[in-house]
């Protein structure tokens, strides 16, 4: 009888559509809420090029913090047995405009085999313009643990699965992407070989901030009313004309709560905050936050903050 790994998790049942169902499930929200406490967001700079992330079990925050610092000799990583990595799910978010050229490559590697090459079928390459995305990588074997150390870049580590990420084709110098890896991993005394699961990459729809756009539209109305109530001329003979870029065909006319004041030659417009009915809500993993402000210091009132998952 052949031994084949079976999983009841959402991720490995009907892999072609399980990611979508998992992303919308209560289980995912609970997983992300729990995992987010570990500060798992990893930033990848285009100038740095590459970033390795060692996949270790997360037993507690202190344990994870020590492990991510490669302090493997504290007894947190056994030297005997096997590392069993069931799956690794990585969310990738861009910090560049959608039109930006460039791509990101994410790979699952085993330093005991090669520190430069990915495991077969464990590599995904996607354009920065295709982000955000969710990527799943699954190995088909368990890794034996030992005391001997291997060199990974400028650090030493014992043989462990790790993620390798590289941004290329982007000429900027800042942070190009952020990663949020979530994985299921444990150590055990038995080992096995598993049916190969190919890498999966699923696109995530960008958030439509329609309610935010409504706030911007209302701010335009406030600004328009403020401009129309200004004097028709100022020193120098310049006249205020009706702003041509503002829509005048709104079904709802908001009262002007703006005031103006002059400080020397500078003229400022103070815009009142909208009422409660104008506040917008961004639904994202059920997370609520504090007030949100728009650019130029114009506050639009309290609302929920948007968090990625």
From Swiss-Prot:
GO CC, one annotated term: host cell plasmodesma
Region (Disordered): 245-273
Locations listed in the record: Host cell junction, Host plasmodesma
Keyword Transport found: yes
UniProt keyword Transit peptide, yes or no: no
InterPro entries named in the record: MPV
Stretch forming the signal peptide: none
Entry superkingdom: Viruses
Polar residues compositional bias, start-end: 246-262
Keywords: Host cell junction, Transport, Viral movement protein
GO biological process entries: transport of virus in host, cell to cell
Function according to Swiss-Prot or TrEMBL: Transports viral genome to neighboring plant cells directly through plasmosdesmata, without any budding. The movement protein allows efficient cell to cell propagation, by bypassing the host cell wall barrier. Acts by forming a tubular structure at the host plasmodesmata, enlarging it enough to allow free passage of virion capsids.
Protein's UniProt name: Movement protein
Natural source organism: Pelargonium zonate spot virus (isolate Tomato/Italy/1982) (PZSV)
